[in-house]
């Protein structure tokens, strides 16, 4: 009995001594531990996620995200679900079908790819036929006022609703005069385009129960929805969730318009745009809220500011290293056709030229960062399917 009591006393004093030691160490090291926590949090908690599906919405900075994903695929030797044949999109504006992917045949063996990011209209059952079960799904949204303005300039000659109207302001003053649902899928660019890209009816009434149900559908399917107006914060959060390196998400803005081809709506025009694209407006408002809530939960304000600053510093460093004159150029100034962006509608799309005199390794790094979407799609297609005829990009001969 006495022996047992002695053992208990020794155990008690050992625990007390340990508690005092921990308390003293915490007092001395409190400041240093707090300083180290951001670094410890930045450590990847596992291998990088390599199965990724990005729903590339229109006029939302999505071409820059596509470049990030293409670069990651190329540097890690991953397979990409690329458009079949001479297509440069995955069947858009029709709902996606698996057969729109090169290498997938109806009735043939199953094909699975690591990355999917070219334009498509979302159709989950068909996407699942070509992507693994553990795929990370994400997308990006933009304020529909500015998304619609960009669509108007970019698709002016293509969209029936835009073709005969002098300005977006005039269109929004009387949209029913120009917009006709019966004119087909091309008009999807003129109303609730992001809603349409998600696979929903862009002409549906914005009734509360319907909208809430569709928002819940998006939340169930997509692990993350980014916001174009906060692109750097979006990339920090994406990097965190995918467990990627900083350089994996550093980018230069692609498919960027010159300031002269950007128009501003009046306050009244902006309100009309929100009403006309009411589904997109509800979509954007909802996921803008969830985006910031996710940032607070995953990172917190201090770590977010720190990582955004790191991202921006690295972008400036690479821009100074890679880009001739450190700034984007218009089409006529870009002599390398591999880097010349596609021009559409009334938009003046800017691109980049590389600084001369770069060594081969740096040229490869920089060229990947500034290669436009169509040329990059064509290059990856040739790499993955060398036995197929290469994709023809007609405007490169212009």
UniProtKB/Swiss-Prot annotation:
One Pfam family linked to the record: Gal-3-0_sulfotr
Membrane topology (UniProt): Single-pass type II membrane protein
Entry's localization field: Golgi apparatus, Golgi stack membrane
Molecular function in Gene Ontology: galactose 3-O-sulfotransferase activity; galactosylceramide sulfotransferase activity
Membrane spanning stretches: 12-29
GO biological process, one term: glycolipid biosynthetic process
UniProt topological domain (Cytoplasmic) ranges: 1-11
Keyword vocabulary terms for this entry: Glycoprotein, Golgi apparatus, Membrane, Signal-anchor, Transferase, Transmembrane, Transmembrane helix
Any one cellular-component term (Gene Ontology): Golgi cisterna membrane
The organism's place on the tree of life at top rank: Eukaryota
Membrane topology (Lumenal): 30-398
EC number: 2.8.2.-
Pathway where it operates: Protein modification; carbohydrate sulfation
List of glycosylated residues: 77, 133, 180, 288, 330, 360
Ways its activity is controlled: Strongly inhibited by Cu(2+) and Zn(2+).
InterPro entries: Gal-3-0_sulfotransfrase, P-loop_NTPase
Family: Belongs to the galactose-3-O-sulfotransferase family.
Biological role stated in the UniProt entry: Transfers a sulfate group to the hydroxyl group at C3 of non-reducing beta-galactosyl residues. Acts both on type 1 (Gal-beta-1,3-GlcNAc) and type 2 (Gal-beta-1,4-GlcNAc) chains with similar efficiency.
Name of protein: Galactose-3-O-sulfotransferase 2
Gene (UniProt): GAL3ST2
